[in-house]
Amino acid sequence: MASTHDYVKDLRNEDIKIYINGEYHHRSEAKISVFDSGFLLGDGVWEGIRLHNSKLIHLEHHIDRLYDGAKSIAMEIHLSKKEIIEAIWSTLNENNMITDTHIRLIVSRGIKSTPYQHPKVTISLPTIVIIPEYKKANKEVIDRGIRLVSVQTRRDSLVQDPKINSLSKMNCISACIEAEKLGAEEGLMLDPNGFVSTCNSTNFFIITNNEVWTSTGEYCLNGV
C-alpha cells in the first residue's frame, strides 16, 4: 500500500554513515544503548529536514522547533544550535550528499541507570543521532494521490502536547493502524471538538479559490 512517505528505492542508502554523539558509524553497525531514554520511553524530540540542491530547507525553523520541544519537556540539549547545524552538515559531507536527502535528527534524554521514567536516573548527556537517507518522492504516488479516511483516534492535549515533535508517536501510530484497517493510506485526525486537526504523518491543507485552509494549529505539530 502506498503512503505519503513513499520514496524511490536507492541502493546508496545501504552504505550510509550515521552520526551518533559525534562519531560516524556504518548503518549496519550504528547502535544505541538499550537503556537509552528514547528506546525505553520515547523520551526525546526529533526533526525531519530535507536537503535539496545543497540547501537544507527551513533549517533554522526546524532547529528552533527542536529546541522549543526540548525545553517544554525540561531537557537541555548540551550542544548549541550552531553545533547541531555543523553536525548535520558534517554528516552530509561524510556521506557526500547534495540533494534528494531526508535527515532524521533525533535527541533523546540520554542513558538511564535503570528502566525508569524519572529524569533523575539519567546518567549521560542527551543522545544525538543524525540519520541521512536518499529519499526522492515516488512519482507514482504524486500522480495517483493517496486515500484519506477520518479516524476515531483524536489529537488531544489532555494527555500529551500535540505541538511537540516527540519521539513518542503512539497517538499517530494508532491513527495510522486504524486508517490501514479501513483501507486508506493516511488517517485524518480530529481535535477534541470534532474539527480537522492533522493527519497521522502529515499536516492537512485544502487549497481552494486561491486560498489555503488548514487547522488552527492548536492540536497538531505546527508545520515548518
Could you say what each language-model-derived stretch is?
Residues 1-188, 192-195, 221:
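Conserved alpha/beta cores of soluble small-molecule-handling proteins
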Residues 188, 195-222:
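Glycine- and Gly-Pro-enriched alpha-helical subdomains that act as flexible
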